[in-house]
Amino acid sequence: MASLITPQFERYVAEQTIARGTVQFDEFIFANIPGLNENNLTQHLTIPTSAQIVHRQAVSQSGVINENAVVYSVTIGTEVGDFDFNFIGLINRSKNLLAVAVQTDTVKKIRNKNAVQGNSITRNMLLEFSGAKALTGINVNANTWQIDFTVRLHGLDEKIRLTNRDLYGRAVFFDDSFLVKRKTGNQFTIQPGNAYVEGVRMDLGTEHHLTANSLPCSIYADVVHHCTVTGEYQTEIKYLTQSKADYVDTANRQHYVQILADIDSQGNVTDRRLLSPFWGMNPLTLDDTTENTKDKLGHTHKLPIASIKKRGITKLSSATNSDSETQAATSKAVKTAYDKAVEVKTTAESKVGLRGNESIQGTKSFESKIIGFRGIGVADSQTYANANHLLNMGANDGDGWIEYKKSNRVIGTIRIRANGELSYNNQKIYHAGAKPQFNTDIEGKPNTLAGYGIGNFKVEQGQGDANGYKTDGNYYLASGQNLPENGEWHIEVVSGGATNAVRQIARKANDNKIKTRFFNGSNWSEWKDAGGDGVPIGSVVSFPRAVTNPVGFLKANGTTFNQQTFPDLYRTLGDSNQLPDLTRSDVGMTAYFAVDNIPSGWIAFDSIRSTVTQQNYPELYQYLVDKYSSISNVPLAEDRFIRNTGNGLNIGQTQSDEIKKHVHRVRTHWADSSDSSIFYDKTKTVIDSRLRTATTTDDNLSDNGFMHPLLDTPMATGGDETRPKSLILKLCIKAKNTFDDVQFWVKAFGVVENVGALDAGTLAQNMQALSESVGQKIKENKQSTLLEINNAKADINQKFLQVQESLSQIKTVWQGNVSSGRINISEKCFGKTLILYLQSSESHRLDDNNNIEPVSFEVGAEIEGKSGGGVYLSATHDVTPHYSSGGSRLYGVGVKKFAVYVGRDGTTIEIEDLSNYFVKRIDIR
């Protein structure tokens, strides 16, 4: 059998712990997985397939063991079945997340059917992890429902057996039950019937046939009362031909062996059963003449004459002085003897027991209790009693005892105390009613996990390099290398025994910081804040506009960034340092709506003059004022058709309605007719003074012969306006930006901390935000000259780039607290600046900012590979002159000198002189 927790469980608990959420497991699954065994369970740490799952059931009960341990229980009733399973899993059903997988030998689950009792199964899973009670929200104590009735049921069975034992003794057989008879040759039969052996009832329904291969022998019944797989109890009987004592088999079941008969070498059977003297015998009428009669059951009877060796019929006698061994005493003889005994008793009581020290010979039976007020002493013989080899028994209101003495010296005493405790020589004897307590009764308890044989988990104080801690456990490091930062840390290591999947979780002592990293078998990853990778680099996230500088983000405004400062973002954007511009606004766009209710953020176009102010809609106000100089100059759309700008038309220009220039002509006469007669049909037109005509008398020869009706004449056609076919909708303008309440930011980096006073990532982000802010302020300042604007921007950008470049190149390669000796840094320093952070006291810390003196050395690139050794580097600080007492003569100079020796490998540094200072950290740039 094997059980494992899953990686999903560990992540789930960690996530809920960080989020202060709730850990929930609500269902058990039972599956039958082919080939599953305890050695390959690690290959099955996912929820089995639906074809393999044979049963699913909600958690029946859950309870608390202690603050860090909870137990989940499920009971499958007898109405469920039939199926086999070898896998049990505890899951979170909504998340489809497997927490614990258990491999077990194949178990059969049988339900009730056809009057055959099924089996019920209870399975419990205990989960232990930090804060389990608080995380799961379970408050019920497991003691209220984790009850095992096995002992109780077994006790009931044992009580019934002991009751039968009290009634029937060791064994009793009724009538011919289990009577052994010879059939022929070595073939024998055992007759059916009932019997009791040590209180266990034996039932033989039919005649049993037995072969005795070797004679002589004896026949024994071997009986055991035990439970079947369904919980049903049955009695099993087998027959032996060799003697065997009562025994307990490999299944821890008690067997009782009772002799039935002896068979001699000729096959003759001697009945050895213990027959009941009063149970099961059918009463028959017998007298002194009964002999060789056969009853209806086939029994034959021959009454023997009673003797001192054999039961039978006998004569009676009233004599009190007879020594006959063939006659029985009558009541009269007994009465006479009784009277004499009373007389003797009276005499004896006056003589025996008054002074004690009498010796009473022979076996005596006492019908009532024996009470000894000074205890009771028992010895095997008078000789042993005289030698004070005694077993003394006694009791009082506090306890009872059995004491063994040898030569009047106490060897040992067993006591039963009034509170139920047992002891031997005043040392407790533990039992089911008085179990030992771990804290008070067990001595010499180990105080380490190793003391309990647990070698794959450690709890200890550590030191040195954190990279070396790969064994599961909890460690405390006051200082060391490769910690997340300076200070004291608690390191939790989780690996499950794997060497290529090691997780370290670091919690800073007396702080809330939590960082984590992993080891893949070759390298350690960088330390990161726990839960800090929720938003991937490059993700676009919206924040309320009130959030002006979220840590880890750059505003998505189309600007560029320094790729050395944000290398991860640069790679994510496809090797580009251009941020997306998501500052676009939709204010000022127009749209038609087919409803009367205008959506939020829009206003009717013709309400601009009355509703748009700098306070209400500042962005739209600015756009319109920039275009039309004043809100009152914004044209009204009214009932106009909207045209596109171009072809001489400008935005905001309005036009009256108009029809392209054209004429309609009506013929009035034929100017080219030879008779020059006027052609005018009064039936087709009207005679009206408003009908203008052009005749041959005017100068415009091309329109001669036509007339032009006026608009107010009946000949005018059309409506009140010129228009195409139309659909009337509501023209509106966007007055408020859709994303007016939010700003878009790009995830640029996780929390990147440099030990010391600077946070490079946040500083770079703040510098970029400062640049944008200043640019905005300059833009708003209409009185600043273009030269001032450009100079200010250039100055800020230059400083920003200098800070970015400087910070991006600094890297910590060692941390510690030494003033002499050798230091090994984590990276070669050839061609770089070596920066040592010094303090005058060993107890000072860099994060105290107390008396920090940085010293830097330039390590030339030409040193790498140099033959003959490394290079000696020195620096001189604080040259102090010393004058004579009168101050007239300079007699010396005090110099603070710092010197180191860099080895040819570029990573070994020998401290030569630090002027009694201590180096706390080394950076390279």
Curated annotation (Swiss-Prot):
Q: What is this protein called?
A: Probable tail fiber protein
Q: Name its species.
A: Haemophilus phage HP1 (strain HP1c1) (Bacteriophage HP1)
A Pfam family of the record is: Collar
- UniProt keyword terms in alphabetical order: Host-virus interaction, Late protein, Viral attachment to host cell, Viral tail fiber protein, Viral tail protein, Virion, Virus entry into host cell
| Similarity annotation | To phage P22 protein H.
Keyword Transit peptide in annotation: no
Q: Name one GO cellular component term.
A: virus tail, fiber
Q: Where in the cell is it found?
A: Virion
Described by its record, this protein's role is as follows: Probable tail fiber that mediates the attachment to the host cell.
Q: Does the keyword Glycoprotein apply?
A: no
Q: Name one GO biological process term.
A: virion attachment to host cell
Read off the SUPFAM superfamilies from this record: Receptor-binding domain of short tail fibre protein gp12
Organism domain of life: Viruses
